[in-house]
Every structure is written in C-alpha cells, then in structure tokens.
C-alpha cells in the first residue's frame, strides 16, 4: 500500500492545528462571518418529566358561591293532630221575629181524613187478596212454610204475633184463609200438657181434634190448625204455613 495518498491529509491536519492555536474568536468572525458567534445560547430542549407532587396545602377559606335557584315544593306531609277548641265567640244580636204562615186547621183535617180513607182502601185490598179481618184483628200469611221459631221471628219483624184465635169467628176466618196447615201462637213448651199463648196466658177457647193433644212424639209442643179448622199438637221443628195477626 502506498503512503503517498495519505500525505496530503497529514499536512492538512498540521496546518489546521497550528491555525486553531493562533486564530481568536473575533478573528474567526471576521474571516467567516457566517459562523455562529461563540458562546451564544442554544435552542430550547424538550420539556422534562413532571416532578413529584408537593405536600398538601392548608385548608382555604370558604368560597363565596352564588345561591342556587329555589327547588320545587316537596310533597304534603301527614295531617297534624286537631288543635284545641277555640273559645266561644261573642253572642250575636237578637234576630227579627220569623214569619209563620197561619195554620189552616181545616186543610190539616181534610188531609188526615184523606189519609185515613186511603189506608182503609189498602186494608181492603190486603184483606181481599192475602188476609182476613175479624173485629180488630187482621190475619195475614206470606204463603211460606217454615219452623215455628222462624214464624215467630217473621211476625215480630212486622210488629205482629203468630195468629192465635180467641173465639170461633177468628178460628173460622183463619180456616177460610189458609190452604195449608198453619202454626198457631199456642205451645206447652214450659209445662207439658198445659197449653198457653205466647205471653203465657191460659186459653179461653180451644178447638182440638179428636184425641188431641196427645203428645204422640213426646216433643209435640206446638199447635197446628188443620184444614178442617181443628187443632193438633205437632213438633215445633216441623215446617208449616206462616200466619201472623196484626192489631188494627
């Protein structure tokens, strides 16, 4: 390998070294004005990494924020307990006398008479269709079959009592009214063999069938009016026609 090609490079190095030792910065600027001035600030580098969080600061003073808008009204709460009664108010002034129309006694009497007439017509209709009237008694049936206790309850509901004939005329009126055997208001529930009405009075009229009362079933404590008008003792638990009497 030849050494000659390297010789020019070696000479250039020596010249550059010697030149750099003698040329100052001011001279270099005169020689090469395009060269950047010596010791001039460089270009800013990239931002560094974030530092660590500092210590927690002291609590600041309360802020002065603006008051918000008023919210919608809430739901109604439960009603409270009633308050104590207030004291009576002052007494008012006496009012003027009222005006009362003159009572027309003749008008009242005519209306009363008309009402009585209408009630009499109603009684006649009932008598014709459903019942019989004898003296001051009105016998009525609803046509239903029931036990003696239910008959008593039914009659009491209408402020009446179970039909109890006190004479032959009343007995015959009931006989003509019924189409089925009906209970009478007579029993010997309290004392066997001693038949009385429902308020405990002894009977002053009877119309027993032949051989009756015989208490054949040992519990025949009620009385039945047969279709022939005669009486027979029967159990109160049996069901027969309901018949009531109304005082008029």
Curated annotation (Swiss-Prot):
<feature type="region of interest" description="Disordered">
    <location>
        <begin position="43"/>
        <end position="111"/>
    </location>
</feature>
<dbReference type="InterPro" id="IPR008160">
    <property type="entry name" value="Collagen"/>
</dbReference>
<keyword id="KW-0176">Collagen</keyword>
<keyword id="KW-0465">Mannose-binding</keyword>
<feature type="disulfide bond">
    <location>
        <begin position="222"/>
        <end position="236"/>
    </location>
</feature>
<feature type="signal peptide">
    <location>
        <begin position="1"/>
        <end position="20"/>
    </location>
</feature>
<keyword id="KW-0964">Secreted</keyword>
<feature type="modified residue" description="4-hydroxyproline">
    <location>
        <position position="88"/>
    </location>
</feature>
<keyword id="KW-0391">Immunity</keyword>
<dbReference type="GO" id="GO:0001867">
    <property type="term" value="P:complement activation, lectin pathway"/>
</dbReference>
<keyword id="KW-1018">Complement activation lectin pathway</keyword>
<dbReference type="InterPro" id="IPR001304">
    <property type="entry name" value="C-type_lectin-like"/>
</dbReference>
<dbReference type="Pfam" id="PF01391">
    <property type="entry name" value="Collagen"/>
</dbReference>
<dbReference type="GO" id="GO:0005537">
    <property type="term" value="F:D-mannose binding"/>
</dbReference>
<dbReference type="GO" id="GO:0005581">
    <property type="term" value="C:collagen trimer"/>
</dbReference>
<feature type="modified residue" description="4-hydroxyproline">
    <location>
        <position position="47"/>
    </location>
</feature>
<dbReference type="GO" id="GO:0005615">
    <property type="term" value="C:extracellular space"/>
</dbReference>
<keyword id="KW-0175">Coiled coil</keyword>
<feature type="modified residue" description="4-hydroxyproline">
    <location>
        <position position="79"/>
    </location>
</feature>
<keyword id="KW-1015">Disulfide bond</keyword>
<feature type="domain" description="Collagen-like">
    <location>
        <begin position="42"/>
        <end position="99"/>
    </location>
</feature>
<dbReference type="InterPro" id="IPR051077">
    <property type="entry name" value="Ca-dependent_lectin"/>
</dbReference>
<feature type="modified residue" description="4-hydroxyproline">
    <location>
        <position position="82"/>
    </location>
</feature>
<dbReference type="InterPro" id="IPR016186">
    <property type="entry name" value="C-type_lectin-like/link_sf"/>
</dbReference>
<feature type="coiled-coil region">
    <location>
        <begin position="112"/>
        <end position="130"/>
    </location>
</feature>
<comment type="subunit">
    <text>Oligomeric complex of 3 or more homotrimers. Interacts with MASP1 and MASP2. Interacts with MEP1A and MEP1B and may inhibit their catalytic activity.</text>
</comment>
<dbReference type="GO" id="GO:0005771">
    <property type="term" value="C:multivesicular body"/>
</dbReference>
<feature type="disulfide bond">
    <location>
        <begin position="155"/>
        <end position="244"/>
    </location>
</feature>
<feature type="compositionally biased region" description="Basic and acidic residues">
    <location>
        <begin position="49"/>
        <end position="61"/>
    </location>
</feature>
<dbReference type="InterPro" id="IPR016187">
    <property type="entry name" value="CTDL_fold"/>
</dbReference>
<keyword id="KW-0180">Complement pathway</keyword>
<keyword id="KW-0379">Hydroxylation</keyword>
<feature type="domain" description="C-type lectin">
    <location>
        <begin position="134"/>
        <end position="245"/>
    </location>
</feature>
<keyword id="KW-0399">Innate immunity</keyword>
<keyword id="KW-0677">Repeat</keyword>
<feature type="compositionally biased region" description="Pro residues">
    <location>
        <begin position="75"/>
        <end position="87"/>
    </location>
</feature>
<keyword id="KW-0430">Lectin</keyword>
<feature type="modified residue" description="4-hydroxyproline">
    <location>
        <position position="73"/>
    </location>
</feature>
<dbReference type="InterPro" id="IPR033990">
    <property type="entry name" value="Collectin_CTLD"/>
</dbReference>
<dbReference type="GO" id="GO:0006958">
    <property type="term" value="P:complement activation, classical pathway"/>
</dbReference>
<comment type="function">
    <text>Calcium-dependent lectin involved in innate immune defense. Binds mannose, fucose and N-acetylglucosamine on different microorganisms and activates the lectin complement pathway. Binds to late apoptotic cells, as well as to apoptotic blebs and to necrotic cells, but not to early apoptotic cells, facilitating their uptake by macrophages.</text>
</comment>
<dbReference type="Pfam" id="PF00059">
    <property type="entry name" value="Lectin_C"/>
</dbReference>
